[in-house]
Design a protein with these regions (language model features):
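Amphipathic alpha-helical recognition patches that constitute DNA-binding helices
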Residues: 16, 92, 125, 136
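Conserved GNAT acetyl-CoA-binding A-motif
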Residues: 118-130
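Helix-loop element at the rim of GNAT/NAT acetyltransferase active sites that forms part
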Residues: 19-36
Length: 173
């Protein structure tokens, strides 16, 4: 792994973010989206995000393996946890790492960056809703201080089967 840097995502990153996300849509149950995003959808998603809810990208600025310098290797974002006003101090994270870069600590760095954004923005609780069979994502969140607080049974249907969701939570002191 080269040197990683984090920055706010811009529309220039839309195609690389879309490629990472659409791989998960088409090949895994990490997201319950069923239809890949178009480039326009991805640009609109990025343009709709601001402040604490801005997307961040992990960019490899010095990849010794010969990849293009400045490649987006992962992204993350915070989203409002629920619509009702009393939930305003809680957020939900989303973290995606390019498949060929899994296991290199990038996801951990993205989650830690999101926790820092959440703390700076005055949030109290960060939630992660993870496919319960997603052992890697569950382990990643545990490593970052999240605790399992519940399992929602058979709440998603993808690839002709039911999927449970693990609800994990990190309280910010």
């Amino acid at each position: 792994m080269g040197t990683l840097t984090f920055r706010l995502a811009t529309v220039v990153d839309a195609e690389q973010i879309r490629a990472i996300y659409n791989h998960e849509v088409m090949h895994t149950a990490a997201t319950f989206d069923l239809v890949p995003r178009s480039l326009r959808d991805q640009v609109e998603w990025l343009e709709a995000r601001s402040g604490a809810f801005s997307a961040i990208v992990a960019v490899d600025v010095a990849d010794p393996a010969g990849a293009v310098a400045g490649e987006v290797v992962g992204f993350g974002a915070l989203s409002p946890y629920k619509e009702r006003a009393a939930y305003r101090t809680s957020v939900e994270d989303s973290v995606y790492v390019r498949r060929d870069r899994n296991g290199q600590g990038i996801g951990t760095l993205i989650v830690r960056e999101l926790l820092s954004v959440a703390a700076t923005s005055g949030f109290h609780a960060v939630f992660a809703r993870i496919n319960a069979s997603g052992e890697g994502s569950i382990a990643l969140h545990r490593k970052c201080g999240f605790e399992l607080v519940g399992i929602e049974l058979e709440v998603g249907r993808k690839f002709s089967r039911w999927h449970d969701v693990a609800l994990m939570q990190h309280l910010i002191n």
